[in-house]
From Swiss-Prot:
It holds the Pfam family Glyco_hydro_1. Its EC number is 3.2.1.21. This is Beta-glucosidase 24. PROSITE patterns: GLYCOSYL_HYDROL_F1_2. GO terms for biological process: carbohydrate metabolic process. The lineage of its organism: Eukaryota, Viridiplantae, Streptophyta, Embryophyta, Tracheophyta. The gene is BGLU24. Keywords: Disulfide bond, Glycoprotein, Glycosidase, Hydrolase, Signal. A beta-D-glucoside binds at Q47, H151, N196, E197, Y340, E411, W460, E467, W468, F476. Glycans are attached at N75, N329, N371, N421.
Length: 504
């Protein structure tokens, strides 16, 4: 395997060296993509909807986390109101249509459908009505709905009852919830995504504690009162994969034949680059990809976790039964790929004295600079360095490693710091974002030309919104939200650029 990986790296290096970068002023056009290619924006329920105590919605773990631990969120903010898309969805869909977008990715709030998390606790008909109205509005405006079933906001009731995704009891409850969604919305929804970024939910929620439910080992820096960073992330990821497979099975058996839809999962990965041209760093780079991307892609395409994870994590990594492995292998019609940034990777030695943790298990060290130069321009968020070529490299890696699956880029975007000293006119000038999308679309188009089966691209995001631990301190939107004046929406220059792109 190691020899194959080294040969792959050499092949990628040779192909990369022959590639030209996008030239300044070079134009990327909609006409360079297939006619049936989807262009949309992505969102999630907790970040957009607000109305957390309206319409029969039950509490989610994010309601609990933001209110119990405001110190973990920038400015102690929360998503109680967010950008109020619950009440303003018609206005928002109108903005999409005006831009010329033909798709919209949003998530259903599990506790808005099942306030107590379980079927036995009752179905919230108001929640079903809201999503029916949103779906109908999208379709009436020619916008294809891509619906995510889980974007991190699991019901607080299940967290209290059995620990949420730490328990395999979640599989049956998630299946029941998904079954309702397929039954109620599947006649119009043709693209389903089971989970958004199971890596982020597992790591942020259970390894470093920066996301809900905020668990990690006490040795960490995040001040967690409960958790085990060496075990819980692997358990939670495992249960998400089992729940995903169970939901895909029920969709294929009960609904897909009649509804003619597709189902997949959205996986996030950084692109990884060896820090030095050494055997150690090249092997470490493969391990880094395994521990972020292969952790989910290997089970989905091969039925088991990467060998590197089995070797290094040992008995802390759960095992699939033969039946589970068979159910997970091939349990997708498409892969959603979320890409934002890249990292240099160094190999490290095993420290027998260190506490077991996901962050050290891969024996890798991430770097954002080499020889005093950053890997790319730094964006608003501390973790986001702009590296456009990485999206092409990750797509080509997926084609070579995982048998060229159908892919939708389900998230790609960049943020700026929310600078309250800027005037509204100044805040709408986002040339960095225009260049970000221009460069990334250029590299997606290059991947297409090299045979990658990419069929859509979703920008993150249509609007500025609640950005998890960053709260409202950063802005990812192509449209500006005025948090001081009734959440009014204003198009940034990137919105106008995207509109022009879609009409060329």
């Amino acid at each position: 395997m190691e020899l194959l990986w080294l040969l792959l790296l050499l092949l990628m290096a040779s192909s990369t060296s022959s590639r030209s970068e996008m030239k300044a002023g070079e134009v990327i056009r909609r006409s360079q993509f297939p006619e049936d290619f989807f262009f949309g924006t992505a969102s999630s329920a907790y970040q957009y909807e607000g109305a957390v105590r309206e319409g029969g919605r039950g509490p989610s773990i994010w309601d609990t986390f933001t209110h119990n631990h405001p110190e973990k969120i920038a400015n102690g903010s929360n998503g109680d109101i967010a950008i109020d898309s619950y009440h303003r969805y018609k206005e928002d869909v109108g903005i999409m249509k005006g831009l010329g977008l033909n798709a919209y990715r949003f998530s259903v709030s599990w506790p808005r459908i099942l306030p107590n998390g379980k079927l036995s606790g009752g179905v919230n008909l108001e929640g079903i009505k809201y999503y029916n109205n949103l779906i109908d509005e999208l379709i009436s405006k020619g916008v294809e709905p891509f619906v995510t079933l889980f974007h991190w906001d699991s019901p607080q009731a299940l967290e209290q009852q059995y620990g949420g995704f730490l328990s395999n009891l979640i599989v049956e409850d998630f299946r029941d919830y998904a079954d309702i969604c397929f039954r109620e919305f599947g006649d119009r929804v043709k693209y389903w995504i089971t989970f958004n970024e199971p890596w982020s939910f597992s790591i942020g929620g259970y390894s470093n504690g920066i996301l809900a439910p905020g668990r990690c080992s006490s040795q960490g820096k995040s001040g967690c009162s409960k958790g085990d960073s060496g075990r819980e992330p692997y358990i939670v990821a495992h249960n998400q994969l089992l729940a995903h497979a169970a939901v895909v099975q029920i969709y294929r058996e009960k609904y897909q034949g009649g509804q003619k839809g597709k189902i997949g999962i959205a996986i996030v990965s950084n692109w990884m680059i060896p820090y030095e041209d050494s055997k150690e760093d090249k092997h470490a780079t493969k391990r880094a990809l395994d521990f972020m991307y292969g952790w989910f892609m290997d089970p989905l395409t091969k039925g088991d976790y990467p060998v590197s994870m089995r070797t290094l994590v040992g008995n802390r990594l759960p095992r699939f039964t033969k039946e589970q492995s068979k159910a997970i292998n091939g349990s997708f019609d498409f892969i959603g790929l979320n890409y934002y940034t890249a990292r240099y990777i160094q190999g490290t030695k095993q420290d027998s004295n260190s506490h077991k943790s996901y962050s050290t298990d891969s024996l890798t060290n991430e770097r954002v600079e080499r020889n005093g130069t950053d890997i790319g321009p730094k964006a608003g968020s501390s973790w986001l360095y702009i590296y456009p070529k990485g999206i092409e490299e990750l797509l080509l890696y997926t084609k070579r490693t995982y048998n060229n699956p159908t892919i939708y880029i389900t998230e790609n975007g960049v943020d700026e710091v929310n600078n309250e000293n800027l005037s509204l006119k100044e805040a709408l000038i986002d040339t960095t974002r225009i260049e970000f999308y221009r460069q990334h679309l250029f590299h997606v188009q290059r991947a297409l030309r090299q045979g990658v089966d990419v069929r859509g691209y979703f920008a993150w995001s249509l609007f500025d919104n609640f950005e998890w631990m960053d709260g409202y301190s950063v802005r990812f939107g192509i449209n500006y939200i005025d948090y001081k004046d009734g959440l009014k929406r204003y198009p940034k220059r990137s919105s106008q650029w995207l509109q022009n792109f879609l009409h060329n």
